[in-house]
């Protein structure tokens, strides 16, 4: 599971 920091970058990746 992604941590908050990694999750935020993952959201940018989806954008």
UniProtKB/Swiss-Prot annotation:
Its EC number is 3.4.24.-. GO terms for molecular function: metal ion binding; metalloendopeptidase activity; toxin activity. GO terms for cellular component: extracellular region. It comes from the Eukaryota. Binds 1 zinc ion per subunit. This is Snake venom metalloproteinase Mlp4.2. Keywords: Calcium, Disulfide bond, Glycoprotein, Hydrolase, Magnesium, Metal-binding, Metalloprotease, Myotoxin, Protease, Secreted, Toxin, Zinc. GO terms for biological process: proteolysis; venom-mediated disruption of extracellular matrix in another organism. Glycosylated. Its cofactor is Zn(2+). Belongs to the venom metalloproteinase (M12B) family. P-I subfamily. It is found in: Secreted. Expressed by the venom gland. Inhibited by the chelating agents EDTA, and 1,10-phenanthroline. Its main location: secreted. Snake venom metalloproteinase that disrupts the muscle fibers interaction with extracellular matrix proteins. In vitro, is able to proteolyse extracellular matrix proteins surrounding muscle fibers such as laminin and fibronectin, but does not show any direct cytolytic activity towards the myogenic cell line C2C12 in culture. In vivo, induces a massive degeneration of myofibers, but has no hemorrhagic activity. Monomer.
């Amino acid at each position: 599971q992604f941590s908050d920091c990694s999750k935020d970058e993952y959201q940018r990746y989806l954008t």
